[in-house]
Amino acid sequence: MGVVTKEQDDLVIRLYIQPKASRDQIVGPHGDELKVAITAPPIDGKANAHLCKFLAKQFKTAKGNILIEKGELGRHKQIRVVMPKEIPEAISVLIP
């Protein structure tokens, strides 16, 4: 499985999360994952909630359409974006 996989209308993305960063951003490829930096600390699910909010803005979709499938408690995550309205350029170039 690559960094980004398209399944019907959804995208499945493997992420490496950098919490407590200076700003929210999609950094780029990181091995076989996509590195995403977020400002929230990894405490009490704050980083996951912030990640979902940030990605929802990037894909112009509702927060409920960003699902963490694997890695709820770690830096390595697999997320599903349900029917994104827009795909950020940093991610669209990684779609096979």
Swiss-Prot record:
GO cellular component term, pick one: cytoplasm
Cross-referenced InterPro entries: DUF167 (IPR003746), YggU-like_sf (IPR036591)
Pfam families hit by this protein: DUF167 (PF02594)
Family matches, as SUPFAM superfamilies: YggU-like
UniProt-recorded name of the protein: UPF0235 protein Shew_1134
Family, per entry: Belongs to the UPF0235 family.
